């Protein structure tokens, strides 16, 4: 039996997991799972206490994407029935921010489909973010695709705090998921974001026929990229996508993955993201002993659980919602 608490203390002392130790976490016997999570919580609590960060997505532009990502219902190769619309207007983005403020959401995430944003779309986001900051004081994360340096600079100047661009999978597995852009394209966008002074957010999707070695490589790559926030998605296979029917995950393995990302990225915000409800199922609360952040509400094209259920879960766990909008901000009608 591995001593997971000892390993956790070593991590807190600066130890970086070896590949052997990382794979052992993913291969942790189910009867040791609670001990593994105890170690993960020891690390989590050292940096984040019992606080949980809440995030909410607005799908600002849906469908119409030319990329061929195998997991995505909005891609060019998907036949899934999804709503398609161009970038929403500023007023729609503001209404979403007002709802996020009411729900004590810490980070409001503006997400748009497509390979990358047009300058006109950047104009819309920039205008909205300036007013969101003035009225609500929320942290804003943008996720608009592959970004040019001048676009990143404009977002930073407008007040965007964070930019999300996921690596999604390992470098070696990436060509099995999409061929319309490269893994290096994604990494370059994360580097562009960092150079602009934006906080980098980059994560993964688990359950896309990758190996455990791939999962370890993902966690290590994100450590090397120094992503401040790491969303861990679990594949919600959608009919009409190339990965439809893929069902490799169970709740216990998902918890081991979350623990791995905590042990390998101890100081970072680890977020349980898409697919939480369908893959963790009744074990969702245990995930927050490793992670310290969740999405509330719906995702891009799939539904989340009722918001009230998430707030009840946090109350039952005894966790505190981290919500600190800028003190000068206030809702104006």
Curated annotation (Swiss-Prot):
Transmembrane domains' residue ranges: none
Metal-binding as UniProt keyword: yes
Gene Ontology molecular function: any one: 4 iron, 4 sulfur cluster binding
Pathway(s) this gene product operates in, as recorded in its UniProt entry: Cofactor biosynthesis; biotin biosynthesis; biotin from 7,8-diaminononanoate: step 2/2
Top enzyme class: transferase
Keywords from the named record: 2Fe-2S, 4Fe-4S, Biotin biosynthesis, Iron, Iron-sulfur, Metal-binding, S-adenosyl-L-methionine, Transferase
Entry superkingdom: Bacteria
Keyword Ribonucleoprotein among record annotations: no
Protein name per UniProt: Biotin synthase
Phylogenetic placement of the source organism: Bacteria, Bacillati, Bacillota, Bacilli, Bacillales
């Amino acid at each position: 039996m591995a001593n997971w608490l000892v390993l956790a203390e070593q991590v807190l002392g600066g130890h970086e997991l070896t590949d052997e130790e990382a794979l052992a976490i993913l291969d942790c016997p189910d009867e040791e799972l609670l001990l593994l999570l105890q170690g993960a919580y020891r690390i989590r609590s050292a940096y984040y206490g019992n606080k949980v960060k809440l995030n909410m997505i607005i799908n600002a532009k849906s469908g119409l994407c030319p990329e061929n990502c195998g997991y995505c219902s909005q891609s060019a190769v998907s036949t899934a029935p999804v709503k398609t619309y161009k970038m929403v207007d500023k007023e729609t983005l503001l209404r979403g921010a007002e709802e996020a403020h009411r729900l004590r959401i810490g980070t409001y995430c503006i997400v748009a489909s497509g390979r990358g944003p047009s300058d006109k779309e950047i104009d819309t986001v920039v205008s909205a973010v300036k007013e969101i900051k003035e009225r609500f004081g929320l942290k804003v994360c943008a996720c608009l695709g592959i970004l040019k340096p001048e676009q990143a600079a404009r977002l930073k100047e407008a007040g965007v705090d964070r930019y999300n661009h996921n690596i999604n999978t390992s470098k070696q597995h990436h060509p099995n998921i999409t061929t319309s852009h490269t893994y290096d394209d994604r990494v370059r966008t994360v580097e562009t974001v960092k150079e602009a002074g934006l906080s980098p957010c980059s994560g993964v999707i688990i359950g896309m026929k990758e190996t455990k070695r791939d999962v370890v490589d993902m966690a290590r790559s994100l450590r090397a990229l120094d992503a401040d926030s790491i969303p861990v998605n679990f594949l919600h296979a959608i009919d009409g996508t190339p990965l439809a029917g893929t069902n490799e995950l169970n709740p216990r393995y998902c918890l081991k993955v979350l623990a791995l990302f905590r042990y390998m990225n101890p100081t970072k915000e680890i977020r349980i993201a898409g697919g939480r409800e369908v893959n963790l199922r009744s074990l969702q609360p245990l995930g927050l002993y490793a992670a310290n952040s969740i999405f509330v509400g719906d995702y891009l094209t799939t539904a989340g659980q009722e918001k009230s259920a998430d707030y009840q879960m946090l109350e039952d766990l005894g966790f505190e919602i981290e919500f600190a909008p800028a003190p000068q901000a206030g809702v104006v009608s």
